[in-house]
Amino acid sequence: MVVEKRNPIPVKEAIQRIVNQQSSMPAITVALEKSLNHILAEDIVATYDIPRFDKSPYDGFAIRSVDSQGASGQNRIEFKVIDHIGAGSVSDKLVGDHEAVRIMTGAQIPNGADAVVMFEQTIELEDTFTIRKPFSKNENISLKGEETKTGDVVLKKGQVINPGAIAVLATYGYAEVKVIKQPSVAVIATGSELLDVNDVLEDGKIRNSNGPMIRALAEKLGLEVGIYKTQKDDLDSGIQVVKEAMEKHDIVITTGGVSVGDFDYLPEIYKAVKAEVLFNKVAMRPGSVTTVAFADGKYLFGLSGNPSACFTGFELFVKPAVKHMCGALEVFPQIIKATLMEDFTKANPFTRFIRAKATLTSAGATVVPSGFNKSGAVVAIAHANCMVMLPGGSRGFKAGHTVDIILTESDAAEEELLL
């Protein structure tokens, strides 16, 4: 079914229509060092207990707890040191009555011992030491399997592999990892007014900023990107390049050509490639004419030619589609609360997304609009790390109001907590 009329739908419904499509990428196996930012295709289980053995979390002395009973400031108890081991070494001594093994962090607890005394809790002599407090069984010991046991699920299918997950995979010996193949993306900027970055400016022309921006956004997600030659406002060539892109890529992103002008051909292109239009208008600003279609398991995104609207469309709609195709556990944008630090008095007949700068503090998040915020603005994008989401039907917001924000970058510094 092709949607002919432009009936605006809510942002959340638009995202839901995208993720309702049956589109998934195949599982592949990659080397551990190539797995960053991929999504796991299966659960990862612990291949052994961690710790693998009872070990010391401190530098100190391994003793029998029973020998420490009765120790006090007035009754210091003495121990004789019979061995010295570091991490990776195992003592062959059996700890006996009032004996101890000098032990370093990470070393295996020797036979006979069941507690560790930290160095700072002792008074050391040449080959003996004394303590002034009793220790209980297993005190200051990391017990075998207390973190994970063999067979425990340590990473879930659908989880994004971040540096911490890399550490887990390496710990359990996963030199290769089964992940979901990431989709490839075609980026096609359209408009007879567009010049390439190296071109000399001409009257009535602007440089193509959307193409490089979308490429960067996609590559930031770890996606393979194909850049196509900037397309003039011509229907036949537009159909041809979109067909070519669909043959080679899983996602096709066009910028421009989605409005209602005389040279906006995207609706006709979607008809020509037999794509089902999921929606062609969203109740939001900027980017209300964002159009998304689906054909043969592939997404076609028609993003606005206005830079801020184009950026907003990628964050709200392309990102969830990529996550959905890769089987991610969470696909919807994450929303957090923040305190607005400046007035924003513009009325919002539809949900409005404002480029802004968020700061996470010990008292919570604060946010300030990032300069000029019209849909065609470019500079505000560079200085933003989030989008403020103002609900439709609101008549502006004052400083001090709580608003919803979507983080788009990870540099929302906790000012009071900076080193």
From Swiss-Prot:
It catalyses: adenylyl-molybdopterin + molybdate = Mo-molybdopterin + AMP + H(+). Pathway: Cofactor biosynthesis; molybdopterin biosynthesis. One of its GO terms (biological process) is Mo-molybdopterin cofactor biosynthetic process. Its EC number is 2.10.1.1. Keywords: Magnesium, Metal-binding, Molybdenum, Molybdenum cofactor biosynthesis, Transferase. SUPFAM superfamilies: MoeA C-terminal domain-like, MoeA N-terminal region -like, Molybdenum cofactor biosynthesis proteins. GO terms for cellular component: cytosol. Its cofactor is Mg(2+). Binds 1 Mg(2+) ion per subunit. One of its GO terms (molecular function) is metal ion binding. It comes from the Bacteria. The keyword Plastid does not apply. InterPro entries: MoaB/Mog-like_dom_sf, MoaB/Mog_dom, MoeA-like, MoeA_C_domain_IV, MoeA_C_domain_IV_sf, MoeA_linker/N, MoeA_linker/N_sf. It is an enzyme of class 2 (transferase). SMART domains: MoCF_biosynth. Belongs to the MoeA family. Catalyzes the insertion of molybdate into adenylated molybdopterin with the concomitant release of AMP. This is Molybdopterin molybdenumtransferase. The lineage of its organism: Bacteria, Bacillati, Bacillota, Bacilli, Bacillales. The gene is moeA.
